[in-house]
Amino acid sequence: RNARRSIFKDDKDRWILLDTLEEVNDRYHWFCHTYCLMNNHYHLVIETPDGNLSKGMRQLNGIYTMRFNRRHGSVGHVFQGRYTAILVQKESHLLEACRYVVLNPLRAKAVEVPERWRWSSYRATAGIERARPCLTIDWILGQFGSKRRTAEKRYRAFVMEGMRGHRIWDDVKGQSILGDEDFVSRLIDYARGYEEVKEIPKVQRYLNRPNLTEIFKNSRGEKRKRNGGIAVAVKRWGYSEREV
């Protein structure tokens, strides 16, 4: 988001962002279920099987900034501050989150119906145009039936019903979690435990850790096993990459 100026000077910039998103999806194994490009910000609904949102967002915004500046002969930041991320429970809230995102242009009074906004994923998911490579629509349509045309029709009706509903972001807990009570509670407990682990001094935390010889004793000569050993040494036992 950039509160003071547009992050897109023209439609070419918008295509560049979507092309960059496609590259990031491929590199970080993301699934983009929904997107909406506004003038001074954009929204994405991203599924990250590898839990690498931060790395991917740095790549997405960084590469787009580089391409934007090169194209327009400018320097400096395109985006102001850090992005806002909300963790969404897939089973109960992801569909609503996707609907909320594609209705942004209507809430901003930029258009009266979602299909008039070219720069969201609504048109592709609704069957009006072909989906760009950066977009995954199968999961959303699968929630509305197995027959494509029927699913698209039900999706369009579902989106329009959202204009009469409440704001889903009013249900966000702790400014970062959207889900049912059990989901929120489990995540808060997990985060609390993670913070407690970080408080334990490193020497105490890794008091009984195996040495590197033990970790790698069964991986000699096998690249795949050695790579697995490196991951265990660094992530599980706190060795630095230099030590490994």
Where in the sequence are the language-model features?
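Amphipathic alpha-helical hairpins
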Residues: 43-44
